Amino acid sequence: MDQTPPARSEPLVSGIRTPPVRRNSKLATLGRIFKPWKWRKKKNEKLKQTTSALEKKMAGRQGREELIKQGLLEMMEQDSESKACSPKEGSQPAQSEPSAGEQETLTSEGVQPGSPSASGTDQASQDELLSSDAHPDDTAKMSSASSGEEADAGNLLPTTDEPSQEALSGSLDSPPRTLERSASQLPSPPLLPTPPPKASSKATKNVTGQAALFQGSSMKNNEPVLRGQLPTPTGSPHLTTVHRPLPPSRVIEELHRALATKHRQDSFQGRECRGSPKKRMDVRLSRTSSMERGKERDEAWSFDGASENKWTAAKDSEENKENLILSSELKDDLLLYQDEEALNDSIISGTLPRKCKKELLAVKLRNRPSKQELEDRNIFPRRTDEERQEIRQQIEMKLSKRLSQRPAVEELERRNILKQRNDQTEQEERREIKQRLTRKLNQRPTVDELRDRKILIRFSDYVEVARAQDYDRRADKPWTRLSAADKAAIRKELNEYKSNEMEVHASSKHLTRFHRP
């Protein structure tokens, strides 16, 4: 079966984005370190892989002819015919017995020319002729029941036209023909179910009772094939679609995916809602109210259309399961992709550290325990006013005892710890110190006296000093040019000084270095 993949998955695979422009911020280097455009590239590669895998799956779906060759559709026809003819043959009174020709005209009118199943009318009419010849009483009962139901439906729903009623009768008379419709011939149903009106549910109670006869055999034989969401047998938009239970592995995968997306959304939305507890409570209340409304709506739909949708649930999911899986996976990927983009932008622009700091402060302030909690955890002891007064009195008594044990002033003076001083005595002491210092300064010896005593010996006393005008720093002077004899005399003088005049410790004499003669 040549069928192109759904057009919804094509524009979602975007090209690789260029790296962001450098910003003059403190955390501009984080963008170059983490390289978020590489994350986007990896995400796009994953999206491409998933879309290619889904395209392969859709390309590998089997057609109607292959299923007939394998014998699956013939088995379903036989089981449905045997189940439809056997139970409760005499329960409904026969009002009219239409002939095979009238039944053929009804079924040909029931198949609309614009419907996808109009191509197989010849084969379906032959099957109906065989079944009507074999069981004329059953066909009469079924046609009379369907005509009565059409009358009731016409009274309840005046907007419904004749072709829809004929399609209803045709679908009831030939249930195997609805099973033979392939996935390529059926239009894709809407992904979200619409609530059915009560009038249509009342009008089709008898229809669902007969459709339940075919449900047992068809569901038992086609459980691995039929799964998920299926179209209605009449093709009318008023009858809703119901999801059949998926296998446990698929359910676990979808649960994990839903939990991951919910965690990401809560983490990003919680940052805005944490600041104001009132806003957070409003969000929780609105979320719980919406969940309760959704549960009530689901329960109403399930009670109204449970019996009529069991027959339609098996086939529609087989036809649309790839589209459903594709849409859910792409939604999750888009959410994760948008979250990563927001995180990368916040890292590059420098807003993430500020948000984290504010969140940490808010969390610390929010998690501060109250006085009651501290008392409950026995960290802050519970005390009454009387107990507090007693504790204060005990502390006062301890302080008064310590103050009474302090020594008196007389005792401190006697121990020479505290000295009584007057201004006159302090001035006299200062005057004595000044006189002593002046006397010492006046008695200082002069430079000549120090030289005589050989106490003050400066560098200028034993070195010839030249005046600044006569001194030249350049070394190319005749008295700086030493000959070999002058150098030898200098070395000899140094050796004599070291050996005779220089005092060296006996243990370190061997370390004295002499110059060569």
Swiss-Prot record:
Residues modified to Phosphoserine: 188
Location(s), subcellular: Nucleus matrix
Residue spans of biased composition, Polar residues class: 92-129, 157-172
Compositionally biased region (Pro residues): 187-198
Gene Ontology molecular function terms on file: actin binding; protein phosphatase inhibitor activity
Ranges in a coiled coil: 408-444
SMART domains: RPEL
Keywords, sorted A to Z: Actin-binding, Coiled coil, Nucleus, Phosphoprotein, Protein phosphatase inhibitor, Repeat
Region described as Disordered: 1-24, 41-247, 260-320
Composition skew (Basic and acidic residues), residue ranges: 54-68, 260-300
Subunit details: Binds actin and PPP1CA; thus inhibiting the protein phosphatase 1 (PP1) activity.
Protein name: Phosphatase and actin regulator 3
Source organism of this protein record: Rattus norvegicus (Rat)
Primary gene name: Phactr3
